[in-house]
């Protein structure tokens, strides 16, 4: 007997930074927001289950559940009982404070990674300016 088609789980892997000082549930939310903003996560894509994320990251399922619940309240995710959790079909607008917070976090991470690779701040600024179209 042929099994019914199950929704295909889209590949999305969360990663945690234990040294960032950012709470784990907040890191999960930030990653989904960044994925949506960048287009890496599109409307309708299925996220891993709470249990799967908890096992993969070796964290408490309640932490994942809290993040998913908050994202659902914000309109980022839709949970369908018995089917899974999906990226919502609506465009999300972020407040000025949220955008500044995200930019600060991304910039800090970028500068840290580039510094570890041996790049100076001056080199980074030049590279960023070179990316900007005239």
Where are these regions (language model features)?
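A short alpha-helical element within helix-turn-helix/winged-helix DNA-binding domains
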Residues: 46-57, 71
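Residues at secondary-structure transition points
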Residues: 19-23, 27, 58, 62, ...
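Extreme N-terminal segment that seeds HTH/winged-HTH DNA-binding domains in transcriptional regulators
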Residues: 1-46, 101, 111-134
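Residue cluster at the C-terminal edge of the helix-turn-helix DNA-binding motif
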Residues: 56, 73-76, 117
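Beta-hairpin "wing" of winged helix-turn-helix
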Residues: 40-45, 72-82, 86-90
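Short, cationic-aromatic polyanion-contact patches
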Residues: 49, 83-100
């Amino acid at each position: 007997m042929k099994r019914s088609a199950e929704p295909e789980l889209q590949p999305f892997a969360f990663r945690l930074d234990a040294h960032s000082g950012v709470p784990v549930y907040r890191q999960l939310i930030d990653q989904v927001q960044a994925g949506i903003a960048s287009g890496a996560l599109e409307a309708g894509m299925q996220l891993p289950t709470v249990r799967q994320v908890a096992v993969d990251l070796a964290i408490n399922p309640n932490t994942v559940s809290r993040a998913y619940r908050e994202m659902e309240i914000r309109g980022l995710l839709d949970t369908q009982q018995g089917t899974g959790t999906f990226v919502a079909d609506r465009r999300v607008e972020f407040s000025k404070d949220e955008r500044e917070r995200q930019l600060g976090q991304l910039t800090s991470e970028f500068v840290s990674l580039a510094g570890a690779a041996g790049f100076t701040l001056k080199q980074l600024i030049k590279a960023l300016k070179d990316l900007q179209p005239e």
